[in-house]
Swiss-Prot record:
Transmembrane segments: none annotated. GO terms for cellular component: cytoplasm; mitochondrion; mitotic spindle pole; spindle microtubule. The keyword Repeat applies. This is Regulator of microtubule dynamics protein 1. Belongs to the RMDN family. One of its GO terms (molecular function) is microtubule binding. The modification N6-succinyllysine is found at residue 165. It comes from the Eukaryota. TPR repeats lie at residues 168-204, 222-258. It is found in: Cytoplasm; Cytoplasm, Cytoskeleton, Spindle; Cytoplasm, Cytoskeleton, Spindle pole. The lineage of its organism: Eukaryota, Metazoa, Chordata, Craniata, Vertebrata. Its main location: cytoplasm. Pfam families: RMD1-3.
Length: 310
């Protein structure tokens, strides 16, 4: 429609230009010299056809460019609509706990450069790796695959909080295959990306929760790992249970009951701080959390065991 309207606007100009050329030819047809440039009538008359051909060629070139623009814009709109449709399907499958179907859907677009697709691919690959039926060999491949998707997402758009979050998660996951030195060194990178994700989106409870896990992990680091870290690094990463608790509570304030593991870790952190009353409060909430995923079921079991110990 846009191209047709442009064509109709252009045609009167072409007809007007053609008439002007013919008028010039007739007025200068006496053979006398005319105007500053001194054209002879015969020269103008002789070149009329060539001029019209040139004008027509220019018009067609213009229309070709206009066609290209319209088609390109339509292609972009179509591609954007298609990506949004895929994302809607992906989010529905994720919320429904359809881990394998989600992975099958997204891997069809693994060559995409869309950041929203890429970080979801990282998440889906990681979720498949976490399934009980996934072999250790397959798990390793999937975790490195997830890291590659997250890395591409981050390279594509450094202002995406989700790309920072999943890049940090995936680096943490592959740490088990990299050795203690690399794992500790990566801790600085992981913390940096979690903090960046929180900065970019302070309302994302998951990023805040993950920062809490980072603190909890280094607060309970075994003494021998701490000793290795002190040997390898002048300032090894460290944290406290109090700091971890702060992040877990902050995540809960942003989005109450958003994640069963956050409830569990609130209980476990209070246990580490010898506050059994508050530990029991949060462990009961974790045990009662509706089990939508395999992880939720595992958390229910762990919470029940910890409550029995109390």
């Amino acid at each position: 429609m846009a191209l047709s309207s442009r064509l109709w606007r252009l045609l009167p100009l072409l007809r007007g230009a053609e008439q002007s050329v013919c008028q010039l030819a007739r007025s200068w047809g006496s053979g006398g010299r005319c105007g500053t440039w001194g054209f002879r009538g015969s020269e103008v008359t002789g070149n009329t056809r060539a001029f019209k051909r040139g004008l027509l060629f220019s018009a067609l070139s213009y229309l070709g460019f206009e066609t290209y623009q319209v088609i390109s814009q339509a292609a972009v709109v179509h591609a954007t609509a298609k990506v949004e449709e895929i994302l809607e399907q992906a989010d529905y499958l994720y919320e429904s706990g359809e881990t394998e179907k989600l992975y099958q859907l997204l891997t069809q677009y693994k060559e995409s450069e869309d950041v929203e697709l890429l970080w979801r691919l990282a998440r889906a690959s990681r979720d498949i790796a976490q399934l009980c039926k996934t072999s250790e060999e397959e798990k390793k491949v999937l975790l490195y695959e997830a890291l590659e998707y997250a890395k591409r997402a981050l390279e594509k758009k450094g202002s995406s909080f989700a790309a920072h979050k999943w890049y940090a998660i995936c680096i943490s996951d592959v740490g088990d295959y990299e050795g203690i030195k690399v794992k500790i060194a990566n801790a600085y990178v992981i913390k940096e990306h979690f903090e960046k994700a929180i900065e970019l989106n302070p309302k994302d409870a998951t990023s805040i929760h993950l920062m809490g896990i980072w603190c909890y992990t280094f607060a309970e680091m075994p003494w021998y790992q701490r000793r290795i870290a002190e040997v390898l690094f002048a300032n090894p990463p460290s944290s406290t249970y109090e700091e971890a608790l702060k992040y877990f509570h902050r995540a809960e304030e942003v989005d109450p009951n958003f994640y069963s593991k956050n409830l569990l870790l609130l209980g476990k952190t209070y246990l580490k701080l010898n506050n059994k009353k508050l530990a029991a409060f949060w462990l009961v909430k974790a045990k009662s959390y509706p089990a939508h995923t395999e992880e939720d079921k595992q958390i229910q079991t762990e919470a029940a065991q910890l409550l029995t110990g109390l």
